[in-house]
């Protein structure tokens, strides 16, 4: 009987957790001072609340998207070109905006960046990247190649 309940519990987790992972988590929104755009889906914001000796900046990775890599991380010339375009799009969107906010969800799986979204004049950067073809939805599954 214990094995039965364990199997039912395991099956429940297998069905529920993937669905939960794709939902947008609850976050906290703050006004943001954007320091720089690292790439299409990573933006560095000022974080003066961090204690010394930490650098007063946080890298925010846009939750739920994958943009092409650029530079040495690109797998092919096409991905590098697309990565440069995604970065340019993000830079332009930030530069044109007058109200910048960040929604923070938590640390990414590696702990070096915070997962979140950037809201520019009331519009989600995540949505803008996907809508304009510079990003794909991504929730941890195997990534699709940008090289085809």
Task: Label every PLM stretch briefly.
Residues 6-7, 94:
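Intrinsically disordered and other compositionally biased segments
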